[in-house]
Amino acid sequence: MPISKTLPYNAIEQIKSYLLQLQNTICVSLESIDGQTKFHEDSWQRAAGGGGKTRIMANGNVFEKAGVNFSHVSGEQLPASASAHREELAGRHFSALGVSLVIHPQNPYVPTTHANVRFFVAEKEDSEPVWWFGGGFDLTPYYGFIEDCEHWHQTALNACLPFGETIYPKFKRWCDDYFFIKHRNEARGIGGLFFDDYNEISFDHSFELMRSIGDHFILAYEPIVARRKDIPFGNREKAFQNYRRGRYAEFNLVYDRGTLFGLQSGGRTESILMSLPPIVHWEYNWHPEKGSNEEKLYTDFLPAKDWLK
């Protein structure tokens, strides 16, 4: 008997329950790592349908700014960013649920990170629903450490292995391609996992894969923070961190599909733009000093590679 891709009647409730639990688990872990500052929760409603819970930590001991956002929005018409490449979505009402987070640390030796898991369904009367999962996690170091990159990608591999040996290399390559700043001709970071439009085998299979990736995020990030958060740094390192944060802002405002979807669908601007760094510095035509640790980021870490060889 073939496995069905039919959407269970309670799919939204299942996913929402998991996402709220994931948001809480991640926030508890980050508060424990920081040891000083708690998240502030801001619940919000969207006039066109839905709402969410945005949790923000600011000026902590370890984290300069961290945002962990849950949203569940719905509407009668899809924004252009979602329907442009999928004609079958025209004329359907939609629901989109997700947890999205971005963490900007105080210490430049601790990488910035982003993670997202989401579900999307578009429905129309007398038609089968169109649904899929998406998400992933990626790492943006300022000063690279090989052992951190290997740990990050090993944890990403562990998240994917239960679903087949082809998943990690596919999602890893997708991440490298997606988080590439075309106008700079450089990667945003050292990658990780990225997937979208995932609707394979069955709803249960697809949901389990999304959960595995969501659950492995904190396992990937926490040990790296623990190793790097107490390394001494000075003005030079902080200035480089703020300069590189400019690349983060450029990517999010120019290319990121989640940002574009949120803004075009009338989402909550404060929650959508929580990903932006608290302090950013642009400097005209700046280049790192030859042989410096700053240059090594560009030469040894940002170019896409297989970290598990």
Swiss-Prot record:
Site feature (Important for dimerization) residues:
183
Q: Which organism is it from?
A: Legionella pneumophila (strain Lens)
The entry assigns this protein to a family as follows: Belongs to the aerobic coproporphyrinogen-III oxidase family.
Name the pathway it acts in. Porphyrin-containing compound metabolism; protoporphyrin-IX biosynthesis; protoporphyrinogen-IX from coproporphyrinogen-III (O2 route): step 1/1
Q: What is its main location?
A: cytoplasm
* Gene3D superfamilies the record matches: Coproporphyrinogen III oxidase, aerobic (3.40.1500.10)
Q: What EC designation does it have?
A: 1.3.3.3
| Catalytic activity as recorded in UniProt | coproporphyrinogen III + O2 + 2 H(+) = protoporphyrinogen IX + 2 CO2 + 2 H2O
Q: Where is this region: Important for dimerization?
A: 248-283
Presence of keyword Aminoacyl-tRNA synthetase: no
Active site per UniProt: 114
Q: What does this protein do?
A: Involved in the heme biosynthesis. Catalyzes the aerobic oxidative decarboxylation of propionate groups of rings A and B of coproporphyrinogen-III to yield the vinyl groups in protoporphyrinogen-IX.
Biological process (GO) annotations held by this record are:
protoporphyrinogen IX biosynthetic process
Binding-site positions, substrate: 100, 116-118, 266-268
- Where can this protein be found? Cytoplasm
Task: Supply one GO CC term from the record.
Answer: cytoplasm
Q: Which UniProt keywords apply?
A: Cytoplasm, Heme biosynthesis, Metal-binding, Oxidoreductase, Porphyrin biosynthesis
Detail which positions bind a divalent metal cation. 104, 114, 153, 183
* Protein name as annotated: Oxygen-dependent coproporphyrinogen-III oxidase
Tell me which cofactor or cofactors this protein depends on. a divalent metal cation
Q: Which domain of life is it from?
A: Bacteria
What the entry lists under Pfam families is as follows: Coprogen_oxidas
Q: Which InterPro entries match?
A: Coprogen_oxidase_aer, Coprogen_oxidase_aer_sf, Coprogen_oxidase_CS
For this chain, one GO molecular function annotation is: protein homodimerization activity
Q: Does the keyword Cell membrane apply?
A: no
